[in-house]
């Protein structure tokens, strides 16, 4: 089973939240997205299992809980991928111009990924950049790795993992799962 839920950070992190949750939340710019992620998780699973953190900081449920999850946010949108199949990774990005995105692609994309981007019409290359970027991030996150490892990932090569991506309006969403799964708009639930 794979469950994908999208929500709005501003909505999920506002309103009446349990004092214990607010006390655990980090301060600063990560606070709203952290709270939104915990709210999404608690809506999907009640009671919420105890959480632990991996070597690179990836949150997970404690041993003995046969569920895995991954969270990602960009702008005001947050994505939750929940699984009973094994470790998962997801990445969501708002498709937006970014300073020196071509230089970044040259630095971290494989030859195959670069060829995929360059094969697009010029007006579609920015969307292709984000499509490839989200796939790479989802793979790294599935492994529990750090952002620095993105350069070592080639999302165009065959893999034992399943990597799927879709574009939703101005959002690029990718998932990396241990068993076959195809991401489509119909497989995504929107949080209220």
Swiss-Prot record:
Matching SUPFAM superfamilies, A to Z? 4'-phosphopantetheinyl transferase (SSF56214)
* Substrates-to-products reaction catalysed: apo-[ACP] + CoA = holo-[ACP] + adenosine 3',5'-bisphosphate + H(+)
Molecular function in Gene Ontology: holo-[acyl-carrier-protein] synthase activity; magnesium ion binding
Among the GO biological process terms of this entry, one is: lysine biosynthetic process via aminoadipic acid
Provide a GO CC annotation, any one: cytosol
Q: Broadest EC class?
A: transferase
> Which UniProt keywords are given for this protein, alphabetically ordered?
Transferase
Q: What is its EC number?
A: 2.7.8.7
Its domain of life reads: Bacteria
Annotated Pfam families: ACPS
What is this protein's function?
A: May be involved in an alternative pathway for phosphopantetheinyl transfer and holo-ACP synthesis. The native apo-protein substrate is unknown.
**Family as reported in the entry's similarity comment:** Belongs to the P-Pant transferase superfamily. Gsp/Sfp/HetI/AcpT family.
What is the protein's given name?
4'-phosphopantetheinyl transferase AcpT
Gene that specifies this protein: acpT
């Amino acid at each position: 089973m794979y469950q994908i839920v999208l929500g709005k950070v501003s909505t999920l992190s506002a309103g009446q939240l349990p004092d214990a949750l607010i006390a655990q939340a980090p301060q600063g710019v990560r606070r709203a997205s952290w709270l939104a992620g915990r709210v999404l998780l608690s809506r999907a699973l009640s009671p919420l299992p105890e959480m632990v953190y991996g070597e690179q900081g990836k949150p997970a449920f404690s041993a003995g809980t046969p569920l895995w999850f991954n969270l990602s946010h960009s702008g005001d949108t947050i994505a939750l991928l929940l699984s009973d199949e094994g470790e998962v990774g997801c990445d969501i990005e708002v498709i937006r111009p970014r300073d020196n995105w071509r230089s970044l692609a040259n630095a971290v994309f494989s030859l195959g990924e670069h060829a995929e981007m360059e094969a697009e019409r010029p007006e579609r290359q920015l969307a292709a950049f984000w499509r490839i970027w989200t796939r790479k991030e989802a793979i790294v996150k599935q492994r529990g790795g750090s952002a620095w490892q993105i350069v070592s990932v080639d999302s165009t090569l065959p893999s034992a993992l399943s990597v799927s991506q879709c574009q939703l309006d101005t959002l690029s969403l990718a998932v990396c799962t241990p068993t076959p799964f195809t991401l489509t708009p119909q497989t995504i639930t929107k949080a209220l």
